[in-house]
């Protein structure tokens, strides 16, 4: 007869996030001792870590915060959405974020080495992965600073934690519009801030492609440059934040909205889980 109850199974599942059968086996092996069962689950998980290294951890969530002048975001990945929406995984991700903020880490190596509990973020990540039973990883860390840093987190699926995160950095005058612009960035996915931000090689490639298309259409060679420049404007409107039609009022560009507010966007970052 088992030396544990359904309540014991439920409590250990809530503590570890492990499956019901794994918890029952551990409690049976531990003769009902919850502490021993917890250690059994942890050790079995650690032994299987190497087997999971080749798996893809492309699900997960974003945890982020801003104090108004500094924004920090971490992407924590799991193999499945089932784990991503687990409250223990969410809590763990928020602890990773707290470690990132406290340590001032600005890159992945620094974050993994940052103090967390009695060890490092890497130590806690491996231990938690052993209990959860999936490959877990820290996908990235983003740290931005500026006069005004606004944050928007978006759930692409109402059943899952945030999958898209945006930081928008503005001058002081931009506080009134920064959050709406962050929401715009989440939806419209601009690649660049403005025309000057487009790398020369990207622009050269786009111009060459447009020239080829225009010539193949049989346009007179003497007007091809003018047509190409017109088509480049369409490229800018699709890819540059300040040139895009504003989500809340498509009759105006984001640049016009900023001008009306007397504001300037100096930087933005858009992150999507797994991308």
Label the predicted regions:
Residues 2-275:
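N-terminal assembly/interaction segments in proteins that build large macromolecular machines
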């Amino acid at each position: 007869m088992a030396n544990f109850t359904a309540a014991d199974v439920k409590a250990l599942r809530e503590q570890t996030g492990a499956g019901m059968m794994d918890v029952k086996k551990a409690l049976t092996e531990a003769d009902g001792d919850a502490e021993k069962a917890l250690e059994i689950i942890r050790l079995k998980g650690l032994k299987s870590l190497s087997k999971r290294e080749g798996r893809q951890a492309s699900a997960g969530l974003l945890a982020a915060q801003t104090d108004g002048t500094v924004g920090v975001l971490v992407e924590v990945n799991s193999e499945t959405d089932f784990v991503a929406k687990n409250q223990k995984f969410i809590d763990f991700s928020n602890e990773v974020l707290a470690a990132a903020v406290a340590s001032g880490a600005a890159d992945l190596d620094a974050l993994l080495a940052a103090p967390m509990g009695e060890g490092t973020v890497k130590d806690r990540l491996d231990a938690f992965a052993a209990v959860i039973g999936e490959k877990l990883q820290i996908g990235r860390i983003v740290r931005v600073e500026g006069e005004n840093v606004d944050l928007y987190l978006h759930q692409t699926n109402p059943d899952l934690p945030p999958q898209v995160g945006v930081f928008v950095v503005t001058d002081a005058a931009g506080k009134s519009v920064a959050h709406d612009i962050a929401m715009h960035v989440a939806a419209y996915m601009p690649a660049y801030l403005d025309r000057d931000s487009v790398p020369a090689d990207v622009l050269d490639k786009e111009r060459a492609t447009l020239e080829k298309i225009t010539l193949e259409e049989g346009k007179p060679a003497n007007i091809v440059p003018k047509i190409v420049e017109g088509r480049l404007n369409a490229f800018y409107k699709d890819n540059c934040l300040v040139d895009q039609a504003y989500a809340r009022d498509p009759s105006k560009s984001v640049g016009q909205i900023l001008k009306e507010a007397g504001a300037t966007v100096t930087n933005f970052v858009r992150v999507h889980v797994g991308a």
